[in-house]
A protein has these predicted regions:
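Positively charged n-region of N-terminal signal peptides that target proteins for export
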Residues: 1-4
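Short amphipathic alpha-helical "recognition" segments used for binding
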Residues: 6-7, 101
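Noncatalytic, solvent-exposed loop/strand surfaces
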Residues: 20-414
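Bacterial N-terminal signal peptides
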Residues: 7-16
């Protein structure tokens, strides 16, 4: 326990060293989909507190990232996978075409689903086409790799796993039937540092995963948490060796239990959504080998999320279910602090919720953002229509909210 407290203190110091306004990866700097401090807007009204709107070139679903005064995202442009940069005043700074686009199949998918990730020096982007690219902050390509050599993309839908950064490497997970890999690349050169196969026998589609890995610490060592193929595993970031694994998520061997929503970490517990939104479990981190029987703290079959990933804020886990129910649970016990719901609608929630200060922002696929104050329970504040479909997650930055729609990028102030 003392070792985990020390690790958490080190992580906190590292995060505080980052620019306060940075959102350097899909779910933010600590992969929780939240920022605890600040006062964020109670409404996202196009006629009242919209600061600017910038036109996007085509349909892309990646959540933008922010570093200081720059916004970075991916999108198709004239049939090409493209990385774009905007300033915080909405001006398009540059756009860099990377290679031929591989179009999305799902109505809420695209060839540009994964988010860019940055260490403040370089940008890294991955596309459904299999192209992995590193650029500088001026949009110049530093290196580029084609990952199609690691096997056919057998996912039924559109690749959505975002790359992440460890202290030394760029980490990519490819999780599909028959050719699943965990890969580490040198951040500077793009050379493969290590690669580990991650193939297991499962019922149909249960080895498909769209989840993004999480960087954690295992007994003082940097580790990568991977969720897919009915297994949660922790691997050394140094060489990919597996520290521990938890199984038993699908004892009845049901078909099509694909992983879409990602795991989150809260209070040294991994919160794992599974069973197509019907199950959720809490697993204590640590141990060695198979920890299935020793580290599972709780399991619930009355809550969960299928496509959206949970958020963690204020020591609690916030679950946005596909039909708009919102559950706030204790990560150590799995018990609900409260269970509420946004107003019902025919559309579902595909984007993940974001907690900024005391506000929870929930993007619905039809382009409506719903907001609740969760400081003390759940107080519904309103719903705000962007006028276009939204799949990306809201991004909080400097007490403003950045929204990426299918056609436009929006920034709202207080």
């Amino acid at each position: 326990m003392k070792k985990y407290l020390l690790i958490n203190l080190v992580l906190l110091l590292l995060f505080n060293c980052l620019h306060a306004d940075n959102w350097p990866a899909w779910r933010g700097e600590n992969a929780t989909g939240s920022t605890d401090s600040g006062t964020y807007p109670s409404e996202l009204n196009l006629n009242k507190n919209l600061l600017w709107k910038a036109v996007l070139p085509d349909k892309g679903c990646s959540t933008p990232i922010v570093w200081e005064n720059s916004i970075f995202l991916t999108s198709p442009l004239n049939g090409k996978d493209t990385v774009l940069s905007f300033s915080m005043d909405g001006e398009r700074k540059w756009q860099t075409p990377i290679g031929p686009e591989r179009k999305g199949k799902h109505r809420n998918g695209s060839g540009s689903n994964p988010s860019v990730v940055t260490n403040g020096k370089s940008l890294y982007a991955l596309f459904k086409s299999g192209i992995l690219v590193c650029l500088n902050f001026s949009g110049k390509i530093i290196w580029q790799k084609d990952l199609s050599g690691y096997g056919k993309d057998t996912l039924y839908w559109d690749f959505g796993t975002s790359p992440i950064l460890s202290s030394k490497h760029l980490i990519v997970a490819l999780m599909r039937k028959g050719n699943s890999w965990l890969l580490a690349f040198d951040q500077t050169t793009g050379e493969v540092v290590w690669k580990k196969e991650r193939n297991f026998q499962t019922p149909p589609e249960c080895d498909h995963s769209y989840a993004t890995p999480t960087l954690i610490n295992h007994d003082g060592r940097e580790a990568i948490l991977v969720w897919g193929a009915e297994r949660l595993s922790a691997h050394s970031s140094k060489d990919g060796e597996m520290f521990w694994v938890s199984t038993g998520f699908n004892p009845k061997q049901k078909k099509n239990w694909v992983v879409v929503g990602s795991q989150v970490v809260a209070a040294d517990v991994v919160i794992v959504p599974y069973g197509r939104g019907t199950h959720m479990t809490g697993i204590r981190m640590g141990g060695t080998g198979d920890i299935t029987e020793t580290h599972r703290l709780w399991t619930r079959t009355d809550t969960g999320c299928f496509v959206p990933s949970p958020s963690v804020a204020h020591g609690r886990v916030y679950i946005l279910r596909d039909r708009g129910e919102v559950h706030c649970i204790d990560p150590k016990t799995g018990r609900s602090h409260w269970e509420e719901a946004f107003p019902r609608a025919s559309s579902s929630y595909y984007g993940s919720p974001t907690v900024a200060g005391s506000k929870l922002y929930a993007p619905r696929e039809d382009g409506v953002i719903l907001i609740a104050d969760v400081a003390e329970g759940f107080t519904f504040l309103g719903e705000f229509d962007m006028g276009e479909r939204i799949i990306a997650s809201p991004v909080p930055v400097n007490e403003k909210i950045l929204i990426r729609g299918e056609e436009n990028l929006f920034l709202f102030g207080g």
